């Protein structure tokens, strides 16, 4: 709701509707900017000869489901959310890695069972270890940056094997 009000404030000359609003055929045809992809309205607008659609801003990084030829033919701008989740995904990956190498799952289970088995968890030191990241795009680069902070030696895999910033070496 707050974001919707912010959009309305910066675009007072536009009518802002959400996917939960009922749109008449005329309102649908008048859409100029679409935030996110509506699986029913979007294809109708692309197929229409009278649609005013000019820009689609996806909220995801992936756009492989879009009809690029139709977008190009109609002159519709397409942008995506590439990289917007790179920090949160990288933090999650490192959190899971740390939980695994420090035996946190076993420790939590023992705590819930009110037991303490000093020999059960096997702790592994991450510092100095090698990490291979499949994909050297924005998420992979952010993960590499965080991993270097833990003194990991970071290698990558990408489509061409080109060296990417933050990686010691990359493979294809």
Residue ranges of model-derived segments:
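Generic structural signal for small/hydrophobic residues in well-ordered secondary structure
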Residues: 34, 56, 71, 93, ...
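Short gly/ser/thr-rich secondary-structure transition/capping motifs
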Residues: 13-20, 36-39, 110-119, 166-172
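Rossmann-like dinucleotide/phosphate-binding beta-alpha-beta segment
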Residues: 121-172
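Short, charged, surface-exposed secondary-structure boundary motifs
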Residues: 26-28, 65-69, 88-92, 165-168
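An N-terminal-biased, well-structured beta-alpha scaffold segment characteristic
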Residues: 1-77
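Phosphate-binding beta-alpha-beta segment of Rossmann-like dinucleotide-binding domains, i.e.
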Residues: 76, 81-130, 156-159
């Amino acid at each position: 709701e707050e974001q919707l009000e912010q959009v309305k404030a910066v675009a007072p000359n536009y009518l802002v509707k959400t996917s939960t609003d009922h749109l008449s055929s005329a309102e649908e045809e008048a859409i100029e900017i679409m935030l996110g992809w509506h699986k029913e309205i979007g294809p109708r607008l692309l197929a229409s000869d009278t649609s005013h659609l000019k820009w689609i801003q996806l909220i995801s990084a992936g756009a492989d489901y879009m009809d690029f030829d139709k977008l190009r033919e109609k002159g519709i701008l397409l942008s995506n959310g590439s990289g917007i989740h790179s920090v949160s995904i990288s933090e999650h990956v490192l959190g899971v890695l740390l939980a695994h190498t420090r035996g946190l799952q076993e420790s939590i289970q023992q705590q819930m069972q009110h037991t303490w088995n000093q020999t059960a968890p096997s702790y592994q030191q991450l510092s100095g270890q090698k990490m291979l990241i499949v994909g050297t795009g924005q998420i992979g680069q952010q993960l590499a940056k965080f991993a270097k902070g833990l003194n990991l030696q970071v290698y990558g895999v990408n489509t061409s094997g080109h060296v990417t910033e933050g990686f010691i070496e990359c493979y294809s």
